[in-house]
């Protein structure tokens, strides 16, 4: 009886955790702690479920920009960066507008990259 309950709980937790996972995948170079070039357009790219809508929200523009993942799962967006500062920025990526499956990049700095 205890083993059956334990098996049921394990199965339930696996199912619930898979519901909250996003299919957004980013290359290693795009991550928390990155530095982006100031006052330019930077390319953010990755992979996701084909046909899904990918949106990016930055704390410096406070608006969403979005695109659709291609048949080969790839997507990309260009984001305009602000002037350099010491402020740590946040970029949130969502799939199909779902906030529960978002990918958050924190501690993003804007400055001179050379």
Where are the regions that the model predicts?
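Bacterial Sec-dependent N-terminal signal peptides
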Residues: 1-22
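A residue-level detector for conformationally permissive "hinge/kink" positions
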Residues: 5-7, 12, 31, 38, ...
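Generic alpha-helix detector with strongest preference for long hydrophobic helices that associate
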Residues: 7-8, 27, 72
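Residue-level detector of functional hotspots within protein domains
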Residues: 10, 28-30, 94, 99
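Non-catalytic, glycine-rich low-complexity segments
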Residues: 21-50, 106-114
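Extended acidic/polar, glycine-enriched regions
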Residues: 45, 49-114
